[in-house]
Amino acid sequence: MCRKKKHIGFCAILVVFVCNAVFLSCADEGEIPNDPISNSPSVSGQYTTVAGQLLKNDEAIQLKGVNCLQTYGLTDAELMNAWGIEISREFIGNLREQPIDGGAIEASDGVWYHPLQQIVNRNRANNRVTILCPFGWVNANGERQLLTGLNPTAQDFYQDYKDKMQRIAEHFKNQQDVWIEVWNEPYHWDNENGYSHVLWLADMEDMVDNLREVDGFESIVIVPGNEQGQSEAALLTHGKDLMRGRYNLLFDLHAYEKWLLDSTESSLITRIEAIQTAGIPFIMGEVGVQNVGDVMPVQHFLNAARATRLTTLAWVWNQNSEDNNALLTNNGEANATAQNNFWGTTYRAFLED
């Protein structure tokens, strides 16, 4: 989760890092994006997306899971098993230096990072799907820029980002239970800073095609929505355009203020079903009880996700009694108090249902 605020996005993981976003001029609505590639194989494999659905072995599925911070160290797999966690979205806070395989490294920011393959191996051994998602970029001076709220192709590190993402795709191309998300929560929370749906389409085409240029990489690629990941407007406007000539795309939305506030279970079911009916395969890659304001209600959303069989992942699997979004206390119990709307036990009940 990266918190949404006017003109600023920030995320408190280990330390608070301030984002100084660089916003450049972007495509206007009149521009025509590049033609989609057409190298789609016949869609097959363990995990696929077909006709707006997420499938496992050709059967529609709903997965329930969490966002994890295992790049900082592996978590207790048995505890995750006890909660019934089926999918883990892994936080990559230092994409440039993140080790893919081998051993842990101490990076330029002074933080130790554990290799992605080690995380995947642990998840796989416990029958969990892994989503690898870049959340931040650390430069040679050890300064981190979080990706949330940014226009991807406007960043000065964008080509280096593409190169690293291709290396990740190359390494995991024969591991179908590893899905790659192109970017965490892009674009301004209120569609400012030069945003347009045409820009979203052009950027997503470029980032998706960058991964598909890796020979043999056919696994699921995850594409975020606009408004820092909370809006489906871009998906409904240009999702089918992005899907044309491409395969195994899965879209990712995040449920915070724009979903949890001023909504009911019924209205959320209608909203979710509108996306599903449009033939747009999507997951709710994050849901949490707090973002930039007060603690929010969440039970109505979980009820709607259950009713629509929407794959859903909580923010966040972490042992921190002081963090309202952490599912666990410091000692590994469910973090559930009146202060956080009993988030730990509420989400565990959703997982076990």
Regions found by a protein language model. Name each.
Residues 1-8:
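N-terminal secretory signal peptides that target proteins for export/translocation
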Residues 8-16:
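Sec-dependent N-terminal signal peptides
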Residues 22-25:
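C-terminal motif of bacterial Sec signal peptides marking the signal peptidase cleavage site
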Residues 27-29:
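Bacterial signal peptide processing site
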Residues 31-89, 97, 103-106, 342, ...:
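N-terminal carbohydrate-binding accessory modules
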Residues 43-48, 63-65, 70-74, 149-153, ...:
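Extracellular glycoside hydrolase catalytic/binding regions
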Residues 74-142, 149, 153-163, 167, ...:
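Aromatic-lined substrate-binding rim segments of carbohydrate-active enzymes
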Residues 96-100, 140-143, 188-192, 323-325:
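A short acidic, helix-capping loop that chelates divalent metal ions and anchors anionic groups
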